[in-house]
Curated annotation (Swiss-Prot):
Native source species: Sinorhizobium fredii (strain NBRC 101917 / NGR234)
InterPro entries assigned: Aminotrans_V_dom, Aminotrans_V_PyrdxlP_BS, Cys_deSase_NifS_bac/arc, Cysteine_dSase, PyrdxlP-dep_Trfase, PyrdxlP-dep_Trfase_major, PyrdxlP-dep_Trfase_small
Required cofactor names: pyridoxal 5'-phosphate
Family, per entry: Belongs to the class-V pyridoxal-phosphate-dependent aminotransferase family. NifS/IscS subfamily.
Protein's name in the database: Cysteine desulfurase
Binding positions for [2Fe-2S] cluster per the UniProt entry: 326
GO molecular function, one term: metal ion binding
């Protein structure tokens, strides 16, 4: 039985071309990019190629605006902490209630340890940002705004280009966590007011452990990691040359294939949703039905537990993600669904399916055969959750 992987918002398969591009840099071309000899220069040249490949994907005006990091979490932390350090007279952060923990956990830490005031802008029942509340939060006390480009659970896309323009009116630095958007949405940063952007290679068929932080030219930046002078003094530490090369190749492939792949992926996603809505009663699609990522659907199966659903689907060779976190004492829903005001009885049964170009029509057919029976079994064996 061929496994069906529908958890691509968690991580993606490394593309074969990406792997082949990386392999020489593990053994044959292994020089330290900071070294002056030929081996180092060759590694450094490969890193510069990757920088230009990523520049093309995100539409950066200058390739030095790209700083390579270990991934999205580091990039998010570096951006927010730098924003506060660059504007010490400002002591407030604006973010959303549905950000990734890489942002929200840091904000909570800053509240407790520094007394930083954090404005968590609410969302509506479809996960869309409350623009009036966002406008109200923007004052000259705000150092940095950090709003995700697209939500990892629901796929809802935020109007970050507009949000950045609003932030500029009060002189705040604007950062976006674009980890879920890169490779799925066309991005042209040079035409926006966005100051910083985070991304991670493993979300678009690159390797794990490598990412980047875009820092617009002229935006003040204070390095999170101190040490050597790598990445123009913005990120100390010997560069992960194989990973960076892989990121660059993945960026090149994403730029070449995005439009074609997205059309196919969206059609499969829509077919999956339509099939489940027709075959299974008491099913609800979460998030914005239109303005969302082409590969993502978050579906609530009322009367079942998302974790139990995930477990049984895994036994059928189907990998997906639950929107709930189950412990021996309680069943809690995701902070995203809570922020959306999703009824508890629906939120605990939420399952996220996130597709990629590696999925096929047969995958969708099999999922549509399996899920109705799984839901029926769970509903017969477990009480409907009270909300």
């Amino acid at each position: 039985m061929r496994p069906i992987y529908l958890d691509n918002n968690a991580t993606t398969r490394v593309d074969a071309e990406v792997l082949q591009a990386m392999l020489p840099f593990f053994a044959d071309v292994f020089g330290n990019a900071s070294s002056m000899h030929d081996a180092g220069a060759t590694a450094g040249a490969a890193i510069n190629v990757a920088r230009r490949q990523l520049q093309a994907l995100i539409g950066a005006k200058f390739d030095p605006e790209i700083t390579f990091t270990s991934g999205g979490t580091e990039s998010n932390n570096a951006a927010i902490l730098s924003g506060l350090e660059a504007m010490p007279e400002r002591t407030e952060i604006v973010t959303s209630a549905v950000e990734h923990p890489a942002v929200l956990t840091l904000c909570t830490h800053l509240e407790k340890t520094r007394g930083t005031k954090v404005h968590k802008v609410p969302v509506d029942h479809q996960g869309r940002l409350d623009l009036d509340a966002y406008q109200d939060a923007l004052t000259h006390r705000v150092a940095i705004v950090s709003i995700m480009w697209a939500n990892n659970e629901t796929g809802t896309i935020f109007p970050v280009v507009k949000l950045a323009e609003m932030a500029k009116k009060v002189g705040a630095i604007f950062h976006t966590d674009a980890v879920q958007a890169i490779g799925k949405l066309p991005i042209d940063l040079k035409s926006t007011a966005i100051d910083m952007l985070s991304l991670s290679a493993h979300k678009f068929h690159g390797p794990k452990g490598v990412g980047a932080l875009y820092i617009k030219r002229g935006v003040p930046f204070h390095a999170l990691i101190k040490g050597g002078h790598q990445e123009r003094d913005r990120r100390a530490g010997t560069e992960n040359t194989p990973g960076i090369v892989g990121l660059g190749k993945a960026a090149e492939l994403a730029l070449d294939c995005m439009d074609k792949d997205n059309a196919i992926i969206r059609s499969f996603r829509d077919r999956l949703e339509k099939g489940l809505l027709e075959r299974v009663p008491q099913v609800f699609v979460m998030g914005d039905p239109v303005t969302r990522l082409p590969n993502t659907t978050s579906i609530a199966f009322e009367g079942v537990g998302g974790e139990a659903m995930q477990f049984l689907l895994n036994r059928h060779g189907i990998a997906c993600s639950s929107g709930s976190a189950c412990t021996s004492r309680s069943l809690s829903t995701s902070h995203v669904l809570k922020a959306m005001g999703t009824p508890h009885r629906q939120a605990v049964g939420a399952v996220r399916f996130s597709l990629s170009g590696y999925n096929c029509e047969e995958d969708i057919d099999r999922v549509l055969r399996v899920i109705p029976a799984v839901v029926k079994k769970l509903r017969e064996s477990r009480p409907v959750f009270a909300g």
